Swiss-Prot record:
One GO MF term attached to the UniProt entry: rRNA binding
UniProtKB keywords: Ribonucleoprotein, Ribosomal protein, RNA-binding, rRNA-binding
Organism (species): Elusimicrobium minutum (strain Pei191)
Entries under SUPFAM superfamilies matching the protein: Translation proteins SH3-like domain (SSF50104)
SMART domains: KOW (SM00739)
Keyword rRNA-binding listed: yes
Function comment: One of two assembly initiator proteins, it binds directly to the 5'-end of the 23S rRNA, where it nucleates assembly of the 50S subunit.
InterPro entries registered for this protein in UniProt: KOW, Rib_uL2_dom2, Ribosomal_uL24, Ribosomal_uL24_CS, Ribosomal_uL24_KOW, Translation_prot_SH3-like_sf
A GO CC term attached to the entry: ribonucleoprotein complex
Family of this protein: Belongs to the universal ribosomal protein uL24 family.
GO biological process: translation
Protein name according to UniProt: Large ribosomal subunit protein uL24
Subunit architecture: Part of the 50S ribosomal subunit.
Top-level taxon: Bacteria
C-alpha cells in the first residue's frame, strides 16, 4: 500500500531508476503522482487572469511502476504488514526488518 510522502523508485518507463516522494495517491484509478518524475508538457489556453502557454506538470504513474524505498537498506521493496506490540498495524521491510513510516 502506497501512501503520501512515501519515498519511491520508478521501476519502468522513461524515468526508470529515478527516486522521488509521492505527492498524491489517486486510489480510484490505482495511480500516484511522484514529485519531479514523469514531467509532461501541457498546453493551456488563457482564461480570465491566468496566462496561457505551455507548462510542465507531473503526470500520474500506475502503482505497479513504483516501489517503496527502504531508508535503511536503500533498496526497492514490497512491505510486509505486521501488528506492532502496541496493536498498531505497521509496514516492515522484508529485507532488513526496518519499520517504514
Amino acid at each position: 500500500m502506497l501512501k503520501k510522502n512515501d519515498s519511491v523508485v520508478i521501476l519502468s518507463g522513461k524515468d526508470k531508476g529515478k527516486k522521488g516522494e509521492i505527492k498524491e495517491v489517486i486510489a480510484s484509478k490505482n495511480r500516484v503522482i511522484v514529485s519531479g518524475v514523469n514531467i509532461v508538457s501541457k498546453h493551456e489556453k488563457p482564461a480570465g487572469n491566468k496566462k496561457g502557454g505551455i507548462i510542465k506538470v507531473e503526470a500520474p504513474l500506475h502503482i505497479s511502476n513504483v516501489a517503496i524505498v527502504c531508508k535503511k537498506c536503500n533498496k526497492a521493496m514490497t512491505p510486509k504488514h505486521t501488528v506492532a506490540n502496541d496493536g498498531a498495524k505497521v509496514r516492515v521491510c522484508r529485507k532488513c526488518g526496518e519499520t517504514v513510516k
